[in-house]
């Protein structure tokens, strides 16, 4: 390093502590980057890469951005998942001896951004910290630096369960210890696209102990400690707005795995990854940013406590029934700014005068809001506003201190009102009267000299001056003015009197700006005292905002209040998919019932492609989610149980994820449901098994249906194109066939989108191909092939029957169903015995044989068949074994 200049040595020393971040190194009016940082930043920011001499034999790569535009460039890098360390000059270059002292004043990361375009006003910006313990458990702590919110929970289960909870937080960055499993880190980065950071310190930092008073479990404290240490190390400033840590338990909320949340498009659409078109988009009628954030949190974690859900529903009902109350509340909420983030800016020290005006305007609405809610005859409402302080003294303080239209910068003056501070008023009097004196002097000098164009001006370099055009210089009295500056067309002069007044005026103006800054920072400290009260108010207002949002959308869309039942039954009359109905924008939407009494667990849904099977399934899931967040639901009547989990396997049909799924993903998602679902869960399986061959797929579908029916008992909607499976209704007493109806008119299919009892009789796949405008010749050929296939052999699928036999309850029994061809031939026997099927594809016996003659290979295969324990095999395993043996026989 000694070969480099002192400044580059200083840069390298600072950079050594921030290897995983871009170092914005302040040099005068620019932030410069060097070496690898410069090369990478020039590429990412599309700025010019240059070089400079740094004392070594080779020039050093360099790029830079102006300090006044740095915010935009920093946001670009953070938006891409990078970190930026901001290194400032911390001493005056004029007084510095040698290299100016520089220090990193802040590390800006995806999880610690306070403001900018990457921060959505209606979304939290959580930073997560994950701690893994030897017993296999994890503790997850989260902080939103913009609002001060802190949460922590203890997690057990698979890595997938952990990923689900991290995903639910929406965190963009996660902090782990340096020994964290690389495999698990890969899952975090690949599955959730998160920035990884490291922090090994886990003790609660000094001064923050009060935030964990209600946390007693050592594991949770360790996770919070890791989180707080990272925040302090990166931010290097006041964190007075951090709120007490809230403990939550995942078993308090409905579980919806990552894939199911995406499939259901709860908060964003699958295709665009945007809010528009999602359930959140439909339900968000909130008037405040903090209300919007709370709504999203509620949607990420629906409740499972019946009493809490009903409390919310009752409040929504109150707002639905009282139009004037609701509209008055909405008008007040429109004037409420983001109290949580304003409090955060106050604590961070980056609040400006306009922010404080927003705070005052917000507080002016609070008394009326609290008064209106206090008049409601509702225990939940009374409990909600209990302890809420309207902060009237703060409103009064801000009202008499801040100008009505202050500048953005707090260093330009014109912030503080007249009458707030006596000394400031005195300085302003001097400044104002001094300027009046200047105007009078200009008029007097014009009269004395007779020069009408004479003027008195000011600039920062020369101060005040008298300017006379060269054409009028001859009219000046000799010795009256002292020459100051010569211009192309004029001369500038000063007088002793003008210099004396200038000193008084400039001193006053300089003191005004400094005093206003000092008064503002003191005011900011006074506001800090109110931060806890402001944060409590923010929670109250946010919750009221979400509840009125539910009421507003419920009335607009004609939703109905659901009745929650402790029974395992679903009764939905005229249910609708809320988002699809909204997108149709007034066009006729066909509602459908979903009636599943306690003794009915599985709906096996068949019907044409594009007929609405997937929409019907999602409809039930969304109705369930809406009910359990406390919103009315799209139906004319709804009685629902409280579900503990929702599992979906909804594939590429109906233009949702369009071919992006694989058979392995399908099986993994099915496995997740089968392994974790309870009888209180909701399972939605759409076309399970279509990602593999017909027989494998059919076998898997049947086995999964039987397992859910016999072993789990969860309410399940299972759609399929395997019409052969509809015979399961005969053997599974809690399964019912339903189908989506369609009719043919003049050779064309018309989808009715109506769910009806019974199985569908055909798929209409070729009609869908016609709708897609495939060539007529291709359609005609498809019809020919279909006619040939429909005239061929029958498939025999295993049907489960209840037969007691050596303590076994299930044995396979053939059930004949019409379907596509199978490569088996029938062997006819010329006696009274029933005809048997030759699974080996052998020729028909021309006559009766007392004992078949088998060759060596056939004898070996027969021996293997005799050893097979069919009762110990799944349908898929049996079919695979049969296929293997058949191949063995066919080999010549």
UniProtKB/Swiss-Prot annotation:
GO terms for cellular component: cytosol. The keyword Transmembrane helix does not apply. This is DNA mismatch repair protein MutS. The keyword Nucleotide-binding applies. Gene3D superfamilies: 1.10.1420.10, DNA repair protein MutS, domain I, MutS, connector domain, P-loop containing nucleotide triphosphate hydrolases. ATP binds at residues 607-614. Keywords: ATP-binding, DNA damage, DNA repair, DNA-binding, Nucleotide-binding. InterPro entries: DNA_mismatch_repair_MutS, DNA_mismatch_repair_MutS-lik_N, DNA_mismatch_repair_MutS/MSH, DNA_mismatch_repair_MutS_C, DNA_mismatch_repair_MutS_clamp, DNA_mismatch_repair_MutS_core, DNA_mismatch_repair_MutS_N, DNA_mismatch_repair_MutS_sf. Belongs to the DNA mismatch repair MutS family. Residues 845-854 have a biased composition (Basic and acidic residues). This protein is involved in the repair of mismatches in DNA. It is possible that it carries out the mismatch recognition step. This protein has a weak ATPase activity. GO terms for biological process: mismatch repair. It comes from Bacillus cereus (strain Q1). One of its GO terms (molecular function) is mismatched DNA binding. SUPFAM superfamilies: DNA repair protein MutS, domain I, DNA repair protein MutS, domain II, DNA repair protein MutS, domain III, P-loop containing nucleoside triphosphate hydrolases. It holds the Pfam family MutS_II. Residues 833-854 are annotated as: Disordered. SMART domains: MUTSac (SM00534), MUTSd (SM00533).
């Amino acid at each position: 390093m000694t070969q480099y200049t002192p400044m580059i040595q200083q840069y390298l020393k600072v950079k050594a502590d921030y290897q995983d971040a871009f170092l914005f190194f302040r040099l005068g009016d620019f932030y410069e980057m060097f070496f690898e940082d410069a090369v990478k930043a020039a590429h990412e920011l599309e700025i010019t890469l240059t070089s400079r001499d740094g004392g070594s034999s080779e020039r050093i790569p360099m790029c830079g951005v102006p300090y006044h535009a740095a915010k935009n460039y920093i946001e670009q890098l953070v938006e891409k998942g990078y970190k930026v360390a901001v290194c400032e000059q911390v001493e005056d270059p004029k007084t510095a001896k040698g290299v100016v002292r520089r220090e990193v004043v802040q590390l800006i990361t995806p999880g610690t951004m306070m403001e900018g375009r990457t921060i959505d006003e209606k979304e939290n910006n959580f930073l997560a910290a994950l701690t893994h313990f030897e017993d296999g458990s994890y503790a997850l702590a989260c902080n939103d630096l913009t609002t001060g919110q802190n949460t922590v929970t203890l997690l057990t289960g698979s890595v997938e369960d952990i990923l689900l909870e991290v995903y639910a937080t929406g965190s963009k960055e996660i902090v782990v210890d340096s020994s964290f499993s690389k495999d698990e880190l890969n899952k975090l980065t690949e599955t959730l696209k998160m920035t990884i950071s490291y922090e090994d310190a886990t003790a609660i930092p000094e001064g923050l102990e009060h935030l964990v008073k209600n946390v007693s479990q050592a594991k949770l404290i360790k996770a919070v400690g890791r989180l707080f240490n990272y925040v302090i190390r990166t931010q290097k400033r006041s964190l007075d707005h951090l709120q007490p840590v809230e403990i939550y338990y995942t078993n308090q909320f409905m579980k919806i795995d990552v894939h199911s949340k995406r499939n259901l498009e709860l908060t964003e659409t699958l295709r665009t990854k945007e809010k528009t078109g999602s359930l959140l988009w439909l339900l968000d009628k909130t008037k405040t940013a903090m209300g919007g954030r709370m709504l999203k949190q509620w949607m990420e974690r629906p409740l499972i406590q019946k009493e809490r859900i009903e409390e919310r529903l009752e409040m929504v009902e109150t707002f639905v029934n009282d139009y004037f109350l609701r509209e008055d509340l909405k008008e007040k909420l429109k004037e409420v700014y983001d109290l949580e983030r304003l409090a955060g800016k106050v604590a961070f020290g980056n609040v400006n005068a306009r922010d404080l005006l927003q705070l005052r305007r917000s507080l002016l609405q609070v008394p009326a809001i609290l008064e209106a809610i206090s008049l409601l005859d509702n225990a939940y409402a009374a409990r909600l506003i209990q302890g809420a302080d309207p902060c009237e003294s703060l409103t009064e303080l801000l009202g008499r201190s801040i100008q009505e239209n202050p500048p953005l910068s707090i260093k330009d003056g014109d912030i503080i009102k007249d009458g707030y501070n006596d000394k400031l008023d005195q300085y302003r009097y001097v400044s104002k009267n001094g300027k009046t004196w200047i105007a009078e002097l200009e008029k007097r000098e014009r009269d004395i000299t007779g020069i009408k164009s004479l003027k008195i001006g000011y600039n920062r370099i020369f101060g005040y001056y008298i300017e006379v055009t060269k054409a009028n210089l001859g009219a000046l009295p000799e010795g009256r003015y002292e020459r100051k500056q010569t211009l192309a067309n004029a001369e500038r002069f000063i007088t002793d009197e003008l210099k004396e007044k200038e000193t008084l005026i400039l001193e006053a103006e300089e003191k005004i700006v400094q005093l206003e800054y000092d008064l503002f920072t003191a005011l900011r400290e006074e506001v800090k005292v109110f931060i806890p009260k402001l944060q409590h108010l923010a929670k109250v207002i946010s919750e009221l905002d979400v509840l009125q949002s539910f009421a507003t959308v419920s009335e607009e869309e004609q939703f109905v209040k659901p009745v929650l039942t402790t029974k395992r039954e679903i009764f939905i009359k005229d249910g609708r998919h809320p988002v699809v109905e909204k997108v149709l924008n007034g066009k006729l939407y066909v509602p459908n019932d979903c009636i599943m009494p306690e003794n009915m667990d599985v709906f096996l849904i068949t019907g044409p492609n594009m007929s609405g099977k997937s929409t019907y399934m999602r409809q039930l899931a969304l109705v369930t989610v809406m009910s359990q967040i406390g919103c009315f639901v799209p139906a004319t009547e709804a009685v629902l149980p409280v579900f503990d989990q929702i599992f979906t396997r909804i594939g590429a049909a109906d233009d949702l994820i369009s071919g992006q799924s694989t058979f392995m993903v399908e099986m993994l998602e099915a496995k997740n449901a089968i392994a974790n679902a309870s009888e209180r869960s909701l399972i939605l399986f759409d076309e399970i098994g279509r990602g593999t061959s017909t027989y494998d797929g059919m076998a898997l579908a049947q086995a999964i249906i039987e397992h859910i029916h016999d072993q789990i008992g969860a309410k399940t909607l299972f759609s399929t194109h395997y019409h052969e499976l509809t015979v399961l209704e005969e053997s599974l007493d809690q399964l019912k066939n339903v189908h989506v109806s369609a009719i043919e008119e003049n050779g064309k299919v018309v989808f009715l989108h109506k769910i009806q009892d019974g199985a569908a009789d055909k798929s209409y796949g070729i009609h869908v191909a016609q709708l897609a405008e495939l060539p007529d010749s291709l359609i005609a050929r498809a019809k020919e092939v279909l006619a040939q296939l429909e005239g061929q052999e029958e498939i025999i699928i295993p049907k489960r029957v209840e037969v007691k036999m050596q303590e076994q309850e299930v044995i396979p029994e053939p059930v004949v169903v019409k379907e596509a061809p199978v490569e088996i031939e029938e062997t006819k026997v010329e006696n009274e015995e029933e005809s048997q099927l030759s699974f080996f594809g052998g020729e028909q016996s021309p006559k009766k044989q007392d004992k078949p003659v088998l060759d060596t290979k056939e004898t070996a295969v027969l021996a293997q068949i005799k050893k097979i324990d069919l009762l110990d095999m799944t349908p898929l395993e049996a079919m695979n074994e049969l296929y293997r043996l058949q191949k063995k026989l066919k080999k010549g």
